[in-house]
Protein backbone atom coordinates (compact mmCIF):
# COMPACT_ATOMS: atom_id res chain seq x y z
CA UNK A 1 0.00 0.00 0.00
CA UNK A 2 1.33 3.44 -0.93
CA UNK A 3 0.79 5.93 1.87
CA UNK A 4 1.60 9.53 2.73
CA UNK A 5 1.57 11.20 6.13
CA UNK A 6 -0.97 14.02 6.30
CA UNK A 7 -0.84 15.69 9.70
CA UNK A 8 -1.29 12.78 12.08
CA UNK A 9 -3.29 10.65 9.66
CA UNK A 10 -2.06 8.09 7.16
CA UNK A 11 -3.60 8.29 3.70
CA UNK A 12 -3.00 6.30 0.54
CA UNK A 13 -3.86 7.32 -3.01
CA UNK A 14 -7.04 5.26 -2.83
CA UNK A 15 -8.34 6.90 0.36
CA UNK A 16 -10.84 9.73 0.18
CA UNK A 17 -10.25 13.00 2.06
CA UNK A 18 -11.96 13.35 5.46
CA UNK A 19 -14.43 15.89 4.06
CA UNK A 20 -17.06 15.91 1.35
CA UNK A 21 -16.87 17.56 -2.05
CA UNK A 22 -19.75 19.77 -1.00
CA UNK A 23 -17.81 20.99 2.05
CA UNK A 24 -14.84 21.92 -0.16
CA UNK A 25 -17.17 23.65 -2.59
CA UNK A 26 -18.55 25.80 0.24
CA UNK A 27 -15.01 26.59 1.37
CA UNK A 28 -14.26 27.81 -2.15
CA UNK A 29 -17.30 30.07 -2.16
CA UNK A 30 -16.21 31.59 1.16
CA UNK A 31 -12.68 32.16 -0.14
CA UNK A 32 -13.95 33.83 -3.30
CA UNK A 33 -16.32 36.06 -1.33
CA UNK A 34 -13.73 36.93 1.31
CA UNK A 35 -15.81 35.66 4.24
CA UNK A 36 -15.27 33.07 6.96
CA UNK A 37 -16.11 29.53 5.81
CA UNK A 38 -19.00 27.64 7.41
CA UNK A 39 -18.11 25.78 10.59
CA UNK A 40 -18.70 22.39 8.96
CA UNK A 41 -16.04 23.04 6.28
CA UNK A 42 -12.40 22.02 6.48
CA UNK A 43 -9.93 24.85 6.91
CA UNK A 44 -8.00 26.14 3.93
CA UNK A 45 -4.78 24.97 5.61
CA UNK A 46 -6.10 21.41 5.97
CA UNK A 47 -7.13 21.24 2.31
CA UNK A 48 -3.78 22.63 1.13
CA UNK A 49 -1.81 20.25 3.36
CA UNK A 50 -3.76 17.31 1.97
CA UNK A 51 -3.07 18.38 -1.63
CA UNK A 52 0.59 19.13 -0.93
CA UNK A 53 1.05 15.62 0.42
CA UNK A 54 -0.99 14.16 -2.42
CA UNK A 55 1.25 15.89 -4.97
CA UNK A 56 4.37 14.76 -3.10
CA UNK A 57 3.14 11.16 -3.08
CA UNK A 58 2.54 11.20 -6.84
CA UNK A 59 6.01 12.71 -7.28
CA UNK A 60 7.51 9.89 -5.21
CA UNK A 61 5.66 7.30 -7.28
CA UNK A 62 7.02 8.80 -10.50
CA UNK A 63 10.57 9.05 -9.17
CA UNK A 64 10.43 5.53 -7.76
CA UNK A 65 10.11 3.63 -11.02
CA UNK A 66 11.67 3.46 -14.48
CA UNK A 67 10.13 5.02 -17.57
CA UNK A 68 10.99 5.06 -21.25
CA UNK A 69 12.56 8.48 -20.65
CA UNK A 70 15.41 8.98 -18.19
CA UNK A 71 16.84 11.83 -16.12
CA UNK A 72 13.50 13.36 -15.23
CA UNK A 73 13.43 16.46 -13.05
CA UNK A 74 10.27 15.98 -10.98
CA UNK A 75 8.85 18.59 -8.61
CA UNK A 76 5.51 19.02 -6.85
CA UNK A 77 3.52 21.69 -5.08
CA UNK A 78 0.09 22.70 -3.87
CA UNK A 79 -1.32 25.82 -5.48
CA UNK A 80 -0.68 28.98 -3.48
CA UNK A 81 -3.60 30.76 -1.85
CA UNK A 82 -3.11 33.93 -3.92
CA UNK A 83 -3.06 32.01 -7.20
CA UNK A 84 -6.02 29.87 -6.19
CA UNK A 85 -8.05 32.88 -5.09
CA UNK A 86 -7.29 34.70 -8.34
CA UNK A 87 -8.47 31.67 -10.30
CA UNK A 88 -11.73 31.44 -8.35
CA UNK A 89 -12.44 35.13 -8.88
CA UNK A 90 -11.42 35.12 -12.53
CA UNK A 91 -13.80 32.23 -13.23
CA UNK A 92 -16.80 32.67 -10.87
CA UNK A 93 -18.48 29.50 -12.13
CA UNK A 94 -15.52 27.39 -10.98
CA UNK A 95 -15.91 25.27 -7.84
CA UNK A 96 -12.97 24.58 -5.55
CA UNK A 97 -13.63 20.85 -5.46
CA UNK A 98 -13.39 20.62 -9.28
CA UNK A 99 -10.12 22.51 -9.77
CA UNK A 100 -7.71 20.05 -11.35
CA UNK A 101 -4.37 21.59 -10.42
CA UNK A 102 -4.57 22.33 -6.69
CA UNK A 103 -2.11 19.43 -6.45
CA UNK A 104 0.48 19.76 -9.19
CA UNK A 105 3.46 17.72 -10.34
CA UNK A 106 5.90 18.94 -12.98
CA UNK A 107 8.28 16.84 -15.06
CA UNK A 108 11.02 18.54 -17.09
CA UNK A 109 13.27 16.42 -19.29
CA UNK A 110 15.33 16.42 -22.46
CA UNK A 111 12.65 14.84 -24.65
CA UNK A 112 11.67 14.70 -28.27
CA UNK A 113 7.98 15.27 -28.94
CA UNK A 114 7.35 11.56 -29.49
CA UNK A 115 9.11 10.70 -26.24
CA UNK A 116 7.03 13.31 -24.44
CA UNK A 117 3.83 11.74 -25.77
CA UNK A 118 4.97 8.24 -24.82
CA UNK A 119 5.90 9.31 -21.29
CA UNK A 120 2.47 10.91 -20.81
CA UNK A 121 0.77 7.68 -21.87
CA UNK A 122 2.95 5.59 -19.57
CA UNK A 123 2.17 7.81 -16.59
CA UNK A 124 -1.55 7.85 -17.37
CA UNK A 125 -1.53 4.04 -17.60
CA UNK A 126 0.45 3.68 -14.37
CA UNK A 127 -2.09 5.69 -12.38
CA UNK A 128 -5.08 4.12 -14.08
CA UNK A 129 -6.12 7.21 -16.03
CA UNK A 130 -7.83 6.85 -19.40
CA UNK A 131 -6.82 8.46 -22.70
CA UNK A 132 -8.99 11.60 -22.29
CA UNK A 133 -6.91 12.33 -19.18
CA UNK A 134 -4.04 13.37 -21.50
CA UNK A 135 -4.27 17.01 -22.57
CA UNK A 136 -1.90 17.98 -25.39
CA UNK A 137 -1.19 21.72 -25.37
CA UNK A 138 1.46 21.65 -28.10
CA UNK A 139 -0.54 22.13 -31.30
CA UNK A 140 -2.91 24.63 -29.69
CA UNK A 141 -0.83 26.32 -26.97
CA UNK A 142 -2.36 28.48 -24.26
CA UNK A 143 -0.89 31.99 -24.59
CA UNK A 144 2.22 30.33 -26.06
CA UNK A 145 2.51 27.73 -23.29
CA UNK A 146 3.22 24.26 -24.67
CA UNK A 147 3.29 21.01 -22.71
CA UNK A 148 1.46 17.72 -22.26
CA UNK A 149 -0.67 17.44 -19.13
CA UNK A 150 -1.97 14.27 -17.49
CA UNK A 151 -5.03 14.77 -15.30
CA UNK A 152 -5.40 12.24 -12.51
CA UNK A 153 -8.68 11.82 -10.68
CA UNK A 154 -7.75 9.60 -7.78
CA UNK A 155 -9.92 8.78 -4.78
CA UNK A 156 -7.53 10.93 -2.73
CA UNK A 157 -8.03 13.88 -5.06
CA UNK A 158 -7.17 15.44 -8.39
CA UNK A 159 -3.60 15.93 -9.57
CA UNK A 160 -2.30 17.68 -12.67
CA UNK A 161 1.00 16.36 -14.02
CA UNK A 162 2.77 18.71 -16.43
CA UNK A 163 5.31 17.13 -18.78
CA UNK A 164 7.62 19.59 -20.53
CA UNK A 165 10.65 19.37 -22.79
CA UNK A 166 13.66 21.49 -21.89
CA UNK A 167 12.67 24.08 -24.50
CA UNK A 168 9.08 24.20 -23.29
CA UNK A 169 10.38 24.54 -19.74
CA UNK A 170 12.75 27.37 -20.67
CA UNK A 171 9.94 29.31 -22.34
CA UNK A 172 7.50 28.73 -19.47
CA UNK A 173 10.01 29.87 -16.86
CA UNK A 174 10.58 33.15 -18.68
CA UNK A 175 6.85 33.67 -19.04
CA UNK A 176 6.49 33.20 -15.29
CA UNK A 177 9.04 36.00 -14.82
CA UNK A 178 6.87 38.25 -16.99
CA UNK A 179 3.77 37.29 -15.04
CA UNK A 180 5.51 38.13 -11.77
CA UNK A 181 6.65 41.52 -13.10
CA UNK A 182 3.58 42.60 -15.07
CA UNK A 183 0.70 40.77 -13.45
CA UNK A 184 -0.49 37.21 -13.93
CA UNK A 185 -3.28 38.44 -16.18
CA UNK A 186 -0.95 38.21 -19.18
CA UNK A 187 -1.37 34.44 -18.94
CA UNK A 188 -5.08 34.87 -19.62
CA UNK A 189 -5.00 37.46 -22.43
CA UNK A 190 -6.26 40.27 -20.22
CA UNK A 191 -5.99 43.79 -21.62
CA UNK A 192 -2.99 45.81 -20.38
CA UNK A 193 -5.17 48.19 -18.37
CA UNK A 194 -6.33 45.23 -16.28
CA UNK A 195 -2.80 44.33 -15.25
CA UNK A 196 -0.53 45.44 -12.44
CA UNK A 197 0.04 49.11 -11.74
CA UNK A 198 3.04 50.68 -13.48
CA UNK A 199 2.75 48.60 -16.64
CA UNK A 200 3.59 50.37 -19.90
CA UNK A 201 1.02 48.83 -22.30
CA UNK A 202 3.08 49.22 -25.48
CA UNK A 203 6.15 47.70 -23.84
CA UNK A 204 4.09 44.84 -22.46
CA UNK A 205 2.54 44.09 -25.84
CA UNK A 206 6.00 44.04 -27.40
CA UNK A 207 7.25 41.64 -24.73
CA UNK A 208 4.28 39.33 -25.16
CA UNK A 209 4.89 39.41 -28.91
CA UNK A 210 8.50 38.37 -28.39
CA UNK A 211 7.33 35.49 -26.19
CA UNK A 212 4.74 34.36 -28.73
CA UNK A 213 7.31 34.42 -31.54
CA UNK A 214 9.77 32.48 -29.41
CA UNK A 215 7.14 29.84 -28.64
CA UNK A 216 6.40 29.38 -32.34
CA UNK A 217 10.11 29.15 -33.17
CA UNK A 218 10.72 26.53 -30.49
CA UNK A 219 7.74 24.51 -31.71
CA UNK A 220 9.21 24.53 -35.22
CA UNK A 221 12.59 23.31 -33.99
CA UNK A 222 11.03 20.54 -31.92
CA UNK A 223 8.98 19.37 -34.90
CA UNK A 224 12.15 19.22 -37.00
CA UNK A 225 13.97 17.17 -34.35
CA UNK A 226 11.06 14.77 -34.09
CA UNK A 227 11.22 14.32 -37.87
CA UNK A 228 14.87 13.29 -37.46
CA UNK A 229 13.81 10.55 -35.03
CA UNK A 230 11.37 9.19 -37.61
CA UNK A 231 13.93 8.71 -40.41
CA UNK A 232 13.65 5.13 -41.61
CA UNK A 233 17.31 4.21 -42.08
CA UNK A 234 19.26 3.78 -38.82
CA UNK A 235 22.50 5.34 -40.05
CA UNK A 236 20.79 8.42 -41.42
CA UNK A 237 18.62 8.66 -38.33
CA UNK A 238 21.63 8.54 -35.99
CA UNK A 239 23.43 11.21 -38.00
CA UNK A 240 20.37 13.46 -38.08
CA UNK A 241 19.78 13.07 -34.34
CA UNK A 242 23.42 13.90 -33.65
CA UNK A 243 23.08 17.15 -35.58
CA UNK A 244 19.77 17.83 -33.84
CA UNK A 245 21.45 17.46 -30.44
CA UNK A 246 24.08 20.05 -31.36
CA UNK A 247 21.39 22.33 -32.74
CA UNK A 248 19.35 21.98 -29.56
CA UNK A 249 22.18 23.36 -27.44
CA UNK A 250 22.47 26.34 -29.78
CA UNK A 251 18.72 26.97 -29.76
CA UNK A 252 18.64 26.83 -25.95
CA UNK A 253 21.45 29.36 -25.64
CA UNK A 254 20.14 31.78 -28.26
CA UNK A 255 16.57 31.63 -26.95
CA UNK A 256 17.74 32.27 -23.39
CA UNK A 257 19.77 35.28 -24.57
CA UNK A 258 16.90 36.59 -26.70
CA UNK A 259 14.36 36.46 -23.88
CA UNK A 260 16.72 37.81 -21.24
CA UNK A 261 17.55 40.76 -23.48
CA UNK A 262 13.87 41.51 -24.14
CA UNK A 263 13.06 41.50 -20.43
CA UNK A 264 16.11 43.58 -19.51
CA UNK A 265 15.29 46.17 -22.17
CA UNK A 266 11.73 46.41 -20.87
CA UNK A 267 12.96 46.89 -17.31
CA UNK A 268 15.40 49.58 -18.45
CA UNK A 269 12.54 51.38 -20.19
CA UNK A 270 10.59 51.40 -16.93
CA UNK A 271 8.11 48.68 -17.85
CA UNK A 272 9.06 46.28 -15.07
CA UNK A 273 7.17 47.96 -12.24
From Swiss-Prot:
Pfam families: RelA_SpoT. InterPro entries: GTP_Pyrophosphokinase, NT_sf, RelA_SpoT. It comes from Mycobacterium bovis (strain ATCC BAA-935 / AF2122/97). This is Uncharacterized protein Mb1401. GO terms for biological process: guanosine tetraphosphate metabolic process. SUPFAM superfamilies: Nucleotidyltransferase.
Amino acid sequence: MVVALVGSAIVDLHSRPPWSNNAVRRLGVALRDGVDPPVDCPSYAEVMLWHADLAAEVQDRIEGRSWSASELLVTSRAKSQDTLLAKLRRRPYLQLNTIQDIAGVRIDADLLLGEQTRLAREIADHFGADQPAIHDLRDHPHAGYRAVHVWLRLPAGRVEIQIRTILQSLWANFYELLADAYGRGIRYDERPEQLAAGVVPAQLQELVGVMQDASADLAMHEAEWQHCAEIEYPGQRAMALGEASKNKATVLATTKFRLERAINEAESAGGGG
